[in-house]
Amino acid sequence: MNVKRITIIVIFLLAFLTGVNFVIFPALGTAFTDPSLFALSSSQFGNLFIPQVICIIISCLAAPFLVNKWGPKIILTFGVLLMLISTGSLWILHYFIEAKSSLFSLLMIMVAFTGTGFGLSITTLNPLAASLFEKENSSAILILQFLVGLGTSTSPLLMNLIGDVKNWMYVPGSIFIAVSAVLMAFLFLKIEKGTFFNLPAHFKISDKLWIFFIAIILYGCIEGTFGSFGGIILKNKGLDNNAANLGLSLFWGGVALNRLLFGILSKRWNLSSFFLVSPLCVGILLFILLVYPNINILLLMMFLIGFFMGSIFPGSIGWGTIEFPAYSVLVSGFLMAANQIGTGTVTNILGHFSNHISFILGILILLMLVISALFFYLKRGSKIKDAF
């Protein structure tokens, strides 16, 4: 097996484990709110993720400049180490579970470490994956994002595997060991900084990149709505709890399947037209969900909404990388931050509109139409066919 192939395997495995590590705190929600363990209130558990969102945004915006100065290997290693410190500390915390007065403050610090580490890691991983496939940048980013998403969906399953919530410490323990092993392998790789990660000495952010930024903030609002509010929407439309949870799983399954297929098939066919019409398709599906919420097709609708949303975010990073090759790492950080801004904003305001589902769906339709209009505007004179 040649060196490049080993590098690709390690990078993509690290992306998967970064996704697993990232959702460890929400995955342990039952342990955190268990009165016999961490005994956090519902509001404390919700507030736990505020520093995470803030730290992700800051680190995503800072990462391009840090990578430009010290190179991708150092920054990615630092990001993974921050997440490992958080996960390892959480693992050790089971020895001090009786000190309940300090637990919330300690968890806030750990979550901040996880957010900072994730922002640095994922912002660096996107262009690093793209640099390994110079003629297939977008495909590489789509597949990498598929693996990150697969990781985020795997971590909650670990709680089901361990059974009793009192065995929660085995989740951070197993993740810590797995990530440490892959990080050790990564440290032995030779990762060149290369021109792919260099920023010009003087630059101005293009107006087109600002448009990408706005589009992804809006996308983040929609993704965040389904991520934190999808179950409530489905129950409002007539599904019971089990069916609503299944619908949410199908939504994320659709997202993951699209990213995998898009990453594979775009190597053979030009999928730029599919990418451009995807926001319109989501808008149409949301409109049907609003005016004709047939309980028999709701689960299919959730899968299709997720499927057509799947390529929008990573595809935008890939497209932006092709449009602005001199700013590839900046594109990654800029759009990762935009996604978190949208997701974080909508997550914190949706609770005030829980009784206005039709209004929420109407806003989502409008946002998708705006995203579609922005993409068609960006298409003019662009290199989108080279991206997909």
Segments and roles (model prediction):
Residues F25-P26, D207-L257:
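Extracytoplasmic gate region of multi-pass secondary transporters
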Residues S59-P72, G163, R259-N270, S354:
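Helix-to-loop junctions at the C-terminal end of transmembrane segments
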Residues K135-E136, I143-I191:
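Helix-loop-helix hairpin linking two adjacent transmembrane segments in secondary transporters
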Residues F324-I357:
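A late C-terminal transmembrane helix in Major Facilitator Superfamily
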Residues M110-F146:
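Cytoplasmic helix-loop-helix junction between adjacent transmembrane helices
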Residues L81-K100, C281-P293:
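C-terminal ends and interior cores of transmembrane alpha-helices
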